[in-house]
Amino acid sequence: MKNIIRTIIILLLPLTIGACATMDAAVRKVQGEYHAVQGQYYLNRGDFAAGRAAFAPRVAQWPDDPELNYFMARFELGGDKPEAALPFIQKAVKLAPANADYRFWEGVTWWALMKPDKERAAYEKALSIDPDHLSANLYLAHNMLDRGRNAEALKLYDKALSLNPDEPQAMFNRAVALERLKRDREMKLAMHRYLENYPDAPLARQGVRMLNEAGDFSWRNHVIGLRTIPLKAVEFRPGTATLTENGEASLRRIGEMLNDKADLNVHVVVYVKGDTALARDRALAVREYVRRQYPKVAPARLAPSWFGKPESIKTDTGTHSLAQSVNIFTKVQ
């Protein structure tokens, strides 16, 4: 009888162990999902200190969990502590070497520590795991651009844009790479695309300067109040004082600012080479258009002036002469 009982126990023991292992795996899966959701919550909120406080005890309890180490690295990076982040992200990479995201964030950590060679190696490893990793392609392109390896950077920005055609950093820096490669025609096309998509982005003003330095004044930076506003050039139909659609759109932006700030006044300066009368008509047309669109804006707040000569504009690349142009800027009291 004892032998029978012992045999039954021996037979049941693997089943019991297997059931426990299955239960442990299920618990770990649920815990992992919870950690992922909560970790992303802290990252999305930018509450890195709270994330660190919540995850530090868990890393102490489960030091070999790659995801916990990853989130700790992200919280330390978010708190501008790359030295503290490094051991966590390195451990995450060691525990899960095939995770492209971990490799990418290892690269970001090396970037924060100003170690460009190690940064590049981490991005390249991420791309060896996942060639379509958008962020790794993008940041490796940045690394190459910083090194002056512009042709390689351009290829990587093209790859990033093939993965996300609207990626703003790739769009802008692609134009920078083209400028450095002295491919001005392509640079202009690339920068126009960026400005059409992101006219209010912080880099838009620099983009307009790049176009202007290349002799393209289809966009202008206008100093309005305390801001510099990139706008499409205020243009008219040839030989007339009739605004184009782009010209009207740019004036609406300026009109909105004048409408919102009653103490803001601007100069409207129009140049037409060899035709002072047309320059005058265009200056008055600008003022009249804003008055019609924004009745609260008194005409006196737009001071018109006009010249029958080209506008001369100095840039870092030299002096440019525009036969016809409109310049609008803040009127100093």
Predicted regions and their residues:
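Periplasmic peptidoglycan-binding/tethering modules of Gram-negative envelope proteins
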Residues: T22, A26-K29, M114, R180-N265, ...
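Alpha-helical segment of the N-proximal tetratricopeptide repeat
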Residues: R28-E67, F71-E83, Q90, V108, ...
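Canonical tetratricopeptide repeat
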Residues: V37, F71, W105, Y139, ...
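Short coil turns that delineate tetratricopeptide repeat
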Residues: P63, P97, P131, P165, ...
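Short, surface-exposed beta-strand segments enriched in small/polar/acidic residues
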Residues: I229-G239, L251-A283, R301-K314
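Periplasmic OmpA/Pal-like peptidoglycan-binding modules at the C-termini of bacterial envelope proteins
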Residues: L284, E288, R292-Q333
